[in-house]
């Protein structure tokens, strides 16, 4: 027997064909959400408060300080928040201290700071009753970047940018004349020496001393001349910078100083963030810049006078490691003191080294480092600016390297916690202005923190983020996989990110650093391709937000691959050589072969085993969760694999789903971590179990109660239904499944079913990927799903009195009320069709709505009883089904309702949808198609043992698409069905073709895995043997019931009077200009005329035509289309005297629309009246006939 048995939870064993020993379990798949939010609660929120506070008033006599914060218990539980359309949030109380600096008086007070949404255990938020997800954002990391560009003459120029987390950009660039310029915050450029002079190093010699001799420095100094001898060089430079930043304002050196300090050196206005400081120090670090350069001077220990490295030595990695302590200490540190006019007058510490120019061995180049400021320094320092300039000047000398902005070492993830912290900071900054003003205005003696703090800007900022940010998304809840995928999504769009139109090809493309960090396959098709990605299965964020991936460390001394796991970011990995997970190893962990396949930076090639530093932990670390669920992924073309991964996320939960015969072993973990199942929190024993709840007695005697969700409506309108797995007496361990969620079976993800599939054509019905299906799948509810729709009706107070929910509805017969209770609300379990009343409701009618006769009667008799019109909630088009639940919310019951609403009724209708012609089906390999025919079981082709085939697919769908994985799955699936086993074939480490054929033989199938098929209609065998097997097929969310649409009479647009468009508006089909040309080409003038008039926007014409048809009279001539009248009115509104003349030059009067038609649906009502009138006339005619 090929393969080995593997247990997945307590309910499933699979035969696995994997060969690689997994040394690391998959991490919790939603930790990117939960860990980030926990960090925010533990430290992020505190940091935001400490950033903004303390706040002083303008005279600096009062100060508001932050002490601490505390979350109290949430007002609603999760379930209550869902039912009441509320948010699942906890009140946050912040303690402030108000200090009066003049009297020394201190007032401490706890202030309510609003309700803050709390993340559920599943990694989601509940906002206004709907489940939402905050998608992590992929953004360019703050730091310093260098780039090169070739001009039209082929000359290479260089550029550099310092990008902060917030604050002004500082850029450097060269021009064609070899002069270096700087730009501050995207303004006009100035010679870079001007900025150096403003920093207090004004002499030309001083500048040359710092940066060393080079053409760029000399050319720039010559360009930057002293224009105004009455000013010092520093003052002149400051004024020049001020002129660029604030053109047109009077320039003084003092105002320029304070402006520059605010732009770059004030931590409250300029923030590199921890990650920015880390990246700047890393890039400008002297050790990486000296690597492999030849030193041009003796390196001497200042304390002992010992020569550490002699001039002429190549600074290899080992030489640098030997003097690392000195490099990190005071080796070659120089202190430069700026002059008194400088922006910052503190001494500047730089580290300076001289190396031999790689281009010209006779020249010496100076390298200046920023002496590694402390991690806590979040603003820029003069040393950073000078070191950046040095690196930039060194690029022209062939030292250093330019950055690739698509490298994942330069792009980082902003997860939930950080996005929330940023939003909270915005709110606090708005509050700060408010607080300052109140402190200054009010009397100091009576002030308390509560009085000066207005929390509205903070709560508004948080609400706005959750409610309307591009990154706060309604959770994709089609099935557990789509939930999981959504939580692990990485988007480059959103505030501070890219836009679809500006994103070029490079940003979207797969980059070598995506390996093990971002999935190269799972991304949407269409305009967002490559901008929305998914985290790879083992991907993990470090404290700076860079994605790390795990590797097994190789002990270089012994050459063994250890089980020690090292997590590397993309730029750390660039320094190493990594071998693939499938490299053959001996028993002792050494490489079995001298040459192994590996990766170093962007190169995939063969390496000697002795140079390998790390080995991949698993073959599936490359791909995301959805992609890792595709068996035989390695045999599929990547475009089809992309479709396969995306379509699994659109699977509809079925009534009785089945896990795949051929899986990848990923199904268990995906179901476990998705949050859709019920998982045991502690060890214990089941003491009670039914469909609604499970009780487990823990070992310490306490009782855990788990509630099972039955048929709740998901965000996608599908049934979210859990099924209990455990029985009384079962022993349960922490992490075990207590109940399956939707699309799960026995603790494994089960998106579809395992039908018997044949690759064959049948009467042409599977042309162009269409799917032919057996009626068995309909009758036995194999592909049946339950869909829930929610409808609501509310009663409000109107000017004419309150609306009422009642059974007493005017002009409605008893038949229509048969399923309503005494209140007028539909009973649970009632079967309803389109147009049936769900909630009977009447609204008071104004006097203007009454006819003259009715008004007269009211004036005489004061009869106010029937002044109501019917505004009941009815079943909309396509909404028929069975009433599953009714929820009633009233003020009396203490429910929170919107202002003006007295009562709210929600009705849930369940539909059972069997598979039908027009539904979309798919396999896991991107092989999708639409059901074209459902054939009776007796007519389907059958196997020699009499088993009818369930589905027939077109064999032409395979070769050109190159997704051969489906054929391998088909054969292996048939073998698994015959053997009665389930199989796991993990991606890139699954069943080989030998394993496949061995299993086929073991199952007793023919050697080519094909079979003779018999025609169900004639009993004759087909001419050729056919590939028949079991393939996992899923039903997708694109169902024909949601798409089929037809209109005869419906609403019209208000201005143009043309029918509305789209199924949602019950609209018509657009007859566009090209369709008009087609009818013109055939000379079908009458058809064309009625399409452009009666059927569209000839208002009087269509009424008369309707009347004529109902009375059986000839249809009158059409009038003028309304849109023509609109055109005339628009031209007249421009002041043009536009008149319409007929063929005899007489003016045609264009009728105005009747006044008071303020409702799109008015014209439908007119048609209804015409119908009633017609019915009345017919009745009169029949009565007179009867009399005769």
UniProtKB/Swiss-Prot annotation:
SUPFAM superfamilies for the chain: beta and beta-prime subunits of DNA dependent RNA-polymerase (SSF64484)
EC annotation from Swiss-Prot or TrEMBL: 2.7.7.6
Signal sequence residues: none
Broad enzyme group: transferase
Top-level taxon in the UniProt lineage: Bacteria
UniProt entry tagged with the keyword Transcription: yes
One term of GO molecular function: DNA binding
Keywords, comma-separated and alphabetical: DNA-directed RNA polymerase, Nucleotidyltransferase, Transcription, Transferase
Reactions that this protein is recorded to catalyse: RNA(n) + a ribonucleoside 5'-triphosphate = RNA(n+1) + diphosphate
A single cellular component GO annotation: DNA-directed RNA polymerase complex
GO biological process: DNA-templated transcription
Function statement: DNA-dependent RNA polymerase catalyzes the transcription of DNA into RNA using the four ribonucleoside triphosphates as substrates.
Annotated NCBIfam families: PRK00405.1, rpoB
Family, as annotated: Belongs to the RNA polymerase beta chain family.
Record protein name field: DNA-directed RNA polymerase subunit beta
């Amino acid at each position: 027997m090929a393969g080995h048995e593997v247990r997945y939870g307590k309910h499933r064993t699979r035969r696995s064909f994997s060969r690689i020993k997994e040394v690391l379990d998959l991490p919790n798949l939603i930790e990117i959400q939960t860990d980030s939010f926990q960090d925010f609660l533990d430290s992020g929120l505190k940091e935001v408060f400490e950033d903004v506070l303390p706040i002083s008033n303008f005279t600096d006599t009062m100060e508001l300080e932050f002490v601490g914060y505390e979350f109290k218990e949430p007002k609603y539980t999760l379930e209550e928040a869902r039912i009441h359309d509320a948010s699942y949030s906890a009140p946050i109380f912040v303690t402030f201290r108000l200090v009066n600096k003049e009297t020394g008086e201190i007032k401490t007070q706890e202030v309510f700071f609003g309700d803050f949404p709390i993340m559920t255990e599943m990694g989601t938020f509940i906002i206004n009753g709907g489940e939402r997800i905050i998608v992590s954002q992929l953004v360019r990391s703050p730091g310093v970047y260098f780039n090169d560009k070739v001009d039209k003459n082929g000359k290479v120029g260089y550029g550099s940018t310092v990008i902060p987390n917030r604050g002004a950009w500082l850029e450097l660039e060269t021009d064609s004349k070899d002069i270096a310029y700087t730009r501050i915050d995207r303004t006009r450029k100035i010679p870079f020496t001007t900025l150096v002079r403003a920093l207090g190093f004004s002499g030309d010699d001083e500048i040359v001393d710092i940066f060393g001799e080079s053409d760029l420095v000399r050319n720039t100094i010559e360009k930057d001349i002293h224009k105004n001898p009455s000013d010092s060089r520093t003052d002149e430079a400051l004024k020049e910078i001020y002129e660029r930043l604030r053109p047109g304002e009077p320039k003084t050196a003092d105002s320029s100083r304070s402006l520059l300090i605010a732009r770059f050196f004030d931590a409250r206005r300029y923030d590199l963030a921890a990650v920015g400081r880390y990246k700047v120090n890393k890039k400008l670090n002297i050790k990486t810049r000296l690597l492999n350069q030849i030193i041009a001077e003796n390196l001497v220990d200042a304390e002992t006078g010992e020569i550490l490295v002699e001039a002429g030595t190549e600074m290899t990695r080992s030489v640098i490691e030997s003097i690392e302590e000195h490099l990190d200490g005071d080796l070659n540190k120089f202190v430069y003191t700026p002059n008194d006019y400088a922006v910052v007058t503190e001494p500047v510490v730089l580290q300076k080294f001289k190396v031999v120019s790689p281009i010209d061995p006779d020249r010496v180049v100076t390298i200046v480092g920023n002496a590694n400021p402390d991690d806590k320094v979040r603003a820029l320092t003069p040393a950073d600016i000078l070191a950046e300039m040095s690196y930039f000047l060194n690029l022209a000398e062939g030292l250093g390297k330019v950055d690739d902005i698509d490298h994942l070492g330069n792009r980082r993830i902003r997860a939930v916690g950080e996005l929330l912290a940023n939003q909270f900071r915005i709110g606090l900054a708005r509050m700060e202005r408010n607080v300052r003003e109140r402190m200054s205005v009010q009397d100091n003696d009576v002030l308390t923190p509560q009085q000066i703090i207005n929390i509205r800007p903070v709560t508004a900022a948080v609400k706005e983020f959750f409610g309307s940010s591009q990154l706060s998304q309604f959770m994709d809840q089609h099935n557990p996989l789509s939930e999981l995928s959504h939580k692990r999504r990485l988007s480059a769009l959103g505030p501070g990110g890219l836009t679809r139109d500006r994103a070029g090809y490079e940003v979207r493309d797969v980059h070598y650093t995506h390996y093990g960090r971002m999935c190269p396959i799972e991304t949407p098709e269409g305009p967002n391709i490559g901008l929305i990605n998914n985290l790879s299965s083992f991907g993990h964020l470090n404290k700076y937000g860079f994605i790390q991936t795990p590797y097994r460390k190789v002990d270089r001394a012994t050459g063994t691959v250890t089980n020690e796991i090292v997590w590397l970011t993309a730029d750390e990995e660039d320094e190493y050589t990594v071998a693939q997970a499938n490299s053959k190893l001996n028993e002792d962990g050494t490489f079995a072969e001298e040459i192994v396949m590996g990766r170093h930076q962007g190169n995939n090639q063969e390496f000697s085993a002795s140079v390998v530093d790390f080995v991949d932990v698993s073959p599936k670390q490359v791909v995301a969760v959805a992609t890792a669920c595709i068996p035989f992924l390695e045999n599929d073309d990547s475009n089809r694999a992309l479709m396969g991964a995306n379509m699994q996320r659109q699977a509809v939960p079925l009534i009785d789903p089945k896990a795949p015969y051929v899986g990848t072993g990923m199904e268990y973990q995906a179901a476990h971590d998705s949050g859709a199942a019920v998982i045991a929190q502690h060890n214990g024993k089941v003491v009670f179990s039914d469909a609604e709840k499970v009780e487990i007695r823990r070992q310490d005697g306490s009782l855990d109660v788990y509630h099972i969700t039955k048929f709740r409506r998901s965000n996608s309108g599908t049934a979210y239904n859990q099924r209990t797995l455990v029985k009384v007496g079962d022993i349960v361990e922490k992490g075990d499944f207590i109940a399956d969620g939707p699309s799960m079976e026995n603790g494994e993800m089960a998106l579809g079913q395992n039908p018997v599939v044949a690759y064959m054509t049948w009467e042409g019905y599977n042309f162009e990927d269409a799917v032919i299906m057996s009626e068995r799948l309909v009758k036995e509810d194999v592909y049946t799903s339950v869909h829930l729709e929610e409808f609501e009706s509310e009663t409000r107070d109107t000017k004419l009195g309150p609306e009422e929910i009642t059974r007493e509805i005017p002009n409605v017969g008893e038949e229509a009320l048969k399923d309503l209770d005494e209140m007028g609300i539909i009973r649970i379990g009632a079967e309803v069709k389109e147009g049936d009343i769900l909630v009977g409701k009447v609204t008071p009618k104004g006097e203007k709505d009454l006819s003259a006769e009715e008004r007269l009667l009211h004036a005489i008799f004061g009869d106010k009883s029937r002044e109501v019109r019917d505004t009941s909630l009815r079943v909309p088009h396509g909404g028929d089904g069975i009433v599953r639940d009714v929820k009633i919310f009233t003020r009396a019951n203490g429910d929170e309702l919107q202002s003006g609403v007295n009562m709210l009724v929600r009705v849930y209708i369940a539909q059972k949808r069997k598979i039908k012609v027009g539904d979309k089906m798919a396999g896991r390999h991107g092989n999708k198609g639409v059901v074209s025919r459902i054939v009776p079981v007796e007519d389907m082709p059958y196997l020699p043992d009499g088993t009818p085939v369930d589905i027939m697919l077109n064999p032409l769908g395979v070769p050109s698409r190159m997704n051969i994985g489906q054929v391998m799955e088909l054969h292996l699936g048939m073998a698994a069905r015959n053997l009665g086993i389930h199989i796991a074939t993990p991606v890139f480490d699954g069943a080989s073709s030998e394993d496949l054929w061995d299993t086929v033989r073991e199952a007793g199938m023919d050697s080519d895995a094909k079979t003779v098929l018999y025609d169900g209609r004639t009993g004759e065998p087909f001419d050729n043997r056919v590939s028949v097997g079991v393939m996992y097929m899923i039903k997708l969310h694109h169902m024909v019931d949601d798409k089929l649409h037809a209109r005869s009479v419906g609403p019209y647009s208000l201005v143009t009077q043309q029918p509305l468009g789209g199924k949602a508006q019950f609209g018509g089909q657009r007859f566009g200009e090209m369709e008009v040309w087609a009818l013109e080409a055939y000379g079908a003038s009458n058809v064309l005329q009625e399409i452009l008039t009666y059927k569209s926007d000839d208002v009087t014409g269509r009424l008369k035509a309707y009347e004529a048809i109902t009375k059986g009279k000839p249809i009158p001539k059409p009038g003028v289309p309304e849109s023509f009248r609109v055109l005339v009115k628009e031209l007249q509104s421009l002041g043009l005297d536009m008149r319409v003349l007929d063929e005899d030059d007489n003016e045609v009067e264009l009728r105005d629309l009747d006044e008071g038609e303020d409702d799109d649906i008015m014209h439908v009502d007119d048609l209804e009246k015409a119908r009633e009138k017609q019915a009345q006339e017919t009745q009169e005619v029949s009565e007179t006939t009867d009399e005769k």
